[in-house]
Structure formats: structure tokens, C-alpha cells
Curated annotation (Swiss-Prot):
Its EC number is 2.5.1.108. Belongs to the DPH1/DPH2 family. DPH1 subfamily. It comes from the Eukaryota. The lineage of its organism: Eukaryota, Metazoa, Chordata, Craniata, Vertebrata. It is an enzyme of class 2 (transferase). PANTHER family: 2-(3-AMINO-3-CARBOXYPROPYL)HISTIDINE SYNTHASE SUBUNIT 1 (PTHR10762:SF1), DIPHTHAMIDE BIOSYNTHESIS PROTEIN (PTHR10762). One of its GO terms (cellular component) is 2-(3-amino-3-carboxypropyl)histidine synthase complex. This is 2-(3-amino-3-carboxypropyl)histidine synthase subunit 1.
Amino acid sequence: MEPERNESGTPSVAVTPAAPINAGRAPVRRVANQIPDEIAHNPLLLEAMKVLPENYNFEIPKTIWRIQQASAKRVALQMPEGLLMFACAIADIIERFTSAETVVMGDVTYGACCVDDYTAQALGADFMVHYGHSCLIPIDATHGVRMLYVFVDIKIDTSHFVDTIRFNFQAGASLALVSTVQFVSALQAARQALQTDYNVTVPQCKPLSPGEILGCTSPRLNKSVDAVVYLGDGRFHLESVMISNPDTKAYRYDPYSKVFSREYYDHSTMLRHRGEAISVATNAKTWGLILGTLGRQGSPKIMEHLESRLQALGCRYVRLLLSEIFPNKLKLFAEVEVWVQVACPRLSIDWGTAFSKPLLTPYEASVALKEAEWQLTYPMDFYANESLGPWTVNHESHRPTRATVRRTQKPEQRKLQCTDVGATVEECPCQEKVETKTE
């Protein structure tokens, strides 16, 4: 049977209300916002998508549909370095199947904090697609441009990952599985396969998805966990969970090379270096505050908090806006005794010794300014909802006051959030999964 079509000619799915309709009032139809068949099954579009790797889900049909829905004229595409090789192909597809022109944003994108809606708007874009990261910046917080996040879920040989864990750990072991957002689906599949023989947890550090970690944000694991297994390439994200759990054995499974390795981190050296930097800063009278301008890295709220603390202590300070922070740049400010960078905590942790003056994180600055206690386990909670203090982005003191909203849905009817266990990319509200009403 031919599907019903709305005024624009696209198919719609009508859901009949279960409750009686009041007499004298026109019935209300709820129309699911789904991809029309003429886009999802367009043979020309499917053929064009073959230039992209099959195991990378760039969600092209949904992107085309969202752009058409928004009647977008200029679409900005932002992606990390590892995905830029596909940017031109995606741009060509968008321009072929929509009336929009595309702009590929070439500035470096290190992570989810680098969402650059400000630049997209300055370029005249009215729609932006950010690839490869989760929705750290909510879609309702972007300015003047509609936002679509594409996680780029990557299919891997999950069975080999599961077999590798079975080979290396005895049955009954307590394991924590973590990853980046690209492999979260594979992580959940592995958990399902392993949970009969192992005590498997997929820890969550909200607002991140279950199992997802960032280079600056990772959960604290229960002491009963025997080992944490990271699914992904590289060490940057893995080191985050290692720093926040120094007593837990860490392993890495590279889904590309299929190599499984035990990983180590020099906690004592890191803590010594950071402690020395804090000690030097304790007696400083002239401070430099750096607000990162690479996308949304910088937090004005943290900046304001640091300024108020320095003012209360009678310390002088200078503000500096930088998209990237290099030692030679900071050497130009000889009068500054200590720097605090509100950008990426890992810059100080990983590269702090490369700078001639102490380069502190907001947390370390709070310790030096006698506001926070030094933690023997270094906190990796920069974007965590439950953090130690106002030197983190999502601390409760920085959240806007929200009016109480009457609950209209029963608890069991609540839509899955991307931070819920078992939620999929398609169910995430940041993907603009909404319902529209037609009279």
C-alpha cells in the first residue's frame, strides 16, 4: 500500500492517538521524523556513497534529509584530522543531492570540545555537521546555526575482540570496558557476549555515553575491577582512564591492527612535575590566564571564577586568547610568573615541562590559590557533571537555572538519551530526533 504523503510530498507515518479526542476539536496527528524512502533507498545516492568505507557510518541519508528539512543554503563540515580524507567526497554528495553549498572547515579539531559553530556562522553557514565526536556541546547551545552530530560509528571485528579477552582473562574476572564514541556500539556488543563468563561493566561519566571516555574526562572505577580494557587506537584517551585509576591494570585492543597490549603510565613522574609547577605558582604575584578559542575549548565561566579568586587575593593577572598554546608564544610575556590555561588539561599534564613558566590547569591553579586540596589520584573530571569544583566546565555552579517543567511523560515512556545505557546513535536527541505535529 502506498504510504501517506504530507504537503511536501514526502512520506509520513501517522500514529493514531490512544486516548479519546474531545468533540469539536480537530484530531492531532503525530508524525515521526524519519528519513523518506526516496532518500534512504535512492539508488543514485547509494551508489555515490560507495566511495566511502563501508564500515564507517557517516549517516549520509540522514544528513541529506536534515539539510533538506532545514532548507539550508550553506553547510559547514567539521571533522578531526583522521576523517578529513573523506571531506571532499561527503561535500560532493551533499551538493549533488541538496540545494546547499558546502564549506569544509580545515582548522585542527582535537576533540568534542572543538565544535566551532562560531566560525561556521562567521562563514555564513546556516547548518553544521560535526563528525567523529559526541554531543558535548548540546544542539540547543549552538549560536545561529543548526547542528547535526554524526558519531561515525565504526564496525569492527567484534568477535576477535571478544575472543582476545577470553584468551587473556580467566572466567569470573571483573572487567571495565571503555572506548571512544566511534566504538561504543561495538563495546556494548562485546559486553553482551562476555557478561555470561565475566563481571563486565561499561562505566559512565555523564554527560558522556556509557563506556565513552575523553582525554580529560574519565570515570573512577570500583576497586573490585581487576582490569580496564580500552577499545581504540592510540593512547591519548586510554591515558585519561589510567590517570584517574592508577591502581587498576590497563590494557588496549587496537581494532585496526588487532593487537592486544598491557599499557603502563608513569604516575609518580607526572604527579611530581605537576606538584612542582603548583609549588612555584604558590608565591606568584603576576598571573596569565589563557582562554582557549579553538572551538568551544575555553570556558568563560571557569575564567570568571579564576579572575574572582585572583582579585580576592590581590594578584595581578593578564588575559590572553589563544587558539593553540606554544612555549615560544608565552615567552613573549616575560613579566608573567605563572600561566593558567582554560583549554585542555592534558596540555599541561602532557607538555607542561616544555614551558619555561608553570602552565597550570584550572584545578592546579585552584590548589595553588588555596581553594582546592591536592588529590593523590589526579582527577580527570573536566567535563563531568559530578566534578570536584568550579574549576571544571559542567560544575553545578556553572549550570543555568532551569524552570521546573511539569512531567508529561511516564518514566517508562521517556526517550533514551545518548547517555543512557543501551541507547543508540539513532535514539540520541542531539541527532534532532523530534516529533512534529500537524493539524
